[in-house]
Amino acid sequence: MPYQFSANLRRHYEELSRFPEGFLAYGDALCSFNPVYGQGMTVACVEAVILRECLGAGAQGIARRFFRKASALIDIPWQIAVGSDLQHPRVQGKRSAQVRFINWYIAKLFRAAQRD
């Protein structure tokens, strides 16, 4: 099935010094995952939990709190998605020791899942 946007794209709103009051970026506006990895909806659902927690602390400064916590959430699935892309030799990017380890681990996990 072809997808309209089949790439990984991350925006770092947590690094902004200012953000308009009353607005909040959420879901794919923070991070768009390649749909083949099936991570986008899961991350958006957990972002909803984070948003609820941030709203509980009051509306003042919510964007900064939310973006910081959402960024920490996104870090791991982002590393997995980008690392998975780097398994393909034609994809350009640095294949660090961490990326190679994550790819090795996920390959082992998939092989084990096929036998279980």
Where are these regions (language model features)?
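FAD/FMN-dependent oxidoreductases across multiple families
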Residues: 1-50, 54-73
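C-terminal helical "tail/cap" subdomain of flavin- and related membrane-associated enzymes
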Residues: 50-116
